Structures are given as structure tokens and as C-alpha cells.
Amino acid sequence: MRKTDINKYVGSHRKKDGAATTAKSIGHIAIKGLSTLVTILIITGIIVSVSLVSFILSMKDESMNYDLHKLQLNYTSFIYVNGANDDSSNPVKYQSLYSSENRVWVDYDKIPAAMKNAIVAIEDKRFWEHKGVDWRRTLGAVTTLFSKGSSYGGSTITQQLIKNVTGDKDVSLTRKAKEIFRALNLEKKYSKEEILAAYLNIVNFGSGSNGVQAAANLYFGKNIENCDIAECAAIAGITQNPAAYSPLVHPDANRKRQQTVLNEMHDQGKITDAEYKTAMAESEHMKFVGKKSENVIDNVPIWN
């Protein structure tokens, strides 16, 4: 073999050895980098898990520290006078007085089934099944928030009650976590009926009315126990946005929302086909008798 051939042969082998060494080095670097990344991910996962567990443990006993039967609420006061048109001495209601909130408490058994079914159908259809938190809706709300960047209501009636009682409405994960654990603990302390009764007596139903009794008085001139299905649906539809769905201010918007409530009640089997048709027909010509802000005065002493 000539010297030039030997040199070529040796050179080619050196190149192959060098390439192999380089590939081997790159492989080692890649493995080392991957190993480091996995280690970082594991450590991060442990830190996040420990932090999450610690956060949950710190929140698990979170409660409202409120007694649903002793809430400090503003109530409407009434002025009565002796009957002027007859010889009886029975007092007649002359005027209702209230300041910032028009509210008349009504017991659970005085609230018609139609009102209870309407509010549950539109606000929290799994109310009677969950333990304070509807995890399917909560997951849907979180998914929507991260995928579309928009909010989606995931709060149950229990959670909404807590928000109304505490006044905590800031948008933060900490507040939402507190609300969740408060809801879980509230349902351990009170029955579904007690929670629903409190909700229906506390929440805002637009035009200064708080609670279903005040809403029925304002919009229909009657007690809530005398309201029919269509009227209850009109009241229930207000809660999502009292300013936008007040029948005194936006009757058309209220009618559309009312019909959405009726559709939900029908789809969920809360009303029959005949009741649905009657209520839908009534919704087309609803009459509201109230006057916005009637008898509202400032700084009225509340007495019962």
C-alpha cells in the first residue's frame, strides 16, 4: 500500500472516530439536560403539591361566622291606620317605608313551589344533589376562563348566598377558594331548605326589592304565596342581572329572561306541558303594577 493510501485510510478513520465522539458527547449532554429538566419538574411538582395541600388545609375549616337565622338585615317597616271606610277597628296598611333595601322576610313554607323551582332551575339545577359546590360547573368555569379568557358562572345558590351575606365580591382565586370551602361547610350546618329560604329572602330582585316577598309586592301587588308560575319565573329571571332584567325598567329583557326560566323549568320536569303553555302565553302580556323607588326614604329607623 502506498503512503498516500495509508494516510487517507488513517485520516478517514480519525474522522469517523471524531464524529462518533462528537455524537456521543451530544448524546451525553442531551441525556444530562433531560435528566436535569425532569429533576426540576419533579421538584417543582413537589413544591406546588405541598403548597396546594397547605393552602387546602388552611381553608378547609373556613366558614362565614354568620347565623342564617340571626342575620343583620334591613327590613321594610309598615304604617297602619284604623279602617276609614268601615266601622271595624281592624288596622289597614297605609304605607311601606324602607331605606336602601325593601325587604319583607317570608318563611319557607309560604314560598310557593313554583318560586323555588324557578330559581333552582335557572340558577343551580343540581342544587338538591350537590354538597354546596357543583364541581361540574366549577370545572366548566375554570376551563372557560383559561380557554376563552371570559367568565362563566359556576357559583351555586349556596355560594351566591355566601357572597351576598359576606359582601366578599373581589375577583381572586383566594376569595373563590374561601367561598368554596364556606359553601361546603355551610351545607354541613344547614339544610337545603334553610339555605334556599335565606337565599330567596336576601338576594336583589331589582328596583330596590330584596327577597321574593318584596319583589312580588312591587311587581305584582300581591304576596309571593299568591304568585303563579309565570310571575315566579319573571321574578327568578331578575337575579342574574337585576339592573338589566328589572321588569319596571326593561320589560322586554325581563320577558325574554322569564321565558328562558320557563324553558328550563319545563326541560327539567318542574312544570307540565299544559302549565308551560299557559305560562308562556301569560308571559306575552304581563302587567307590572309597581312604581320604581316608591316610598323610599333616607335613614329610616327600622322597627318591627
Located regions from the model:
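Juxtamembrane regions of bacterial inner-membrane/periplasmic proteins
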Residues: 2-304
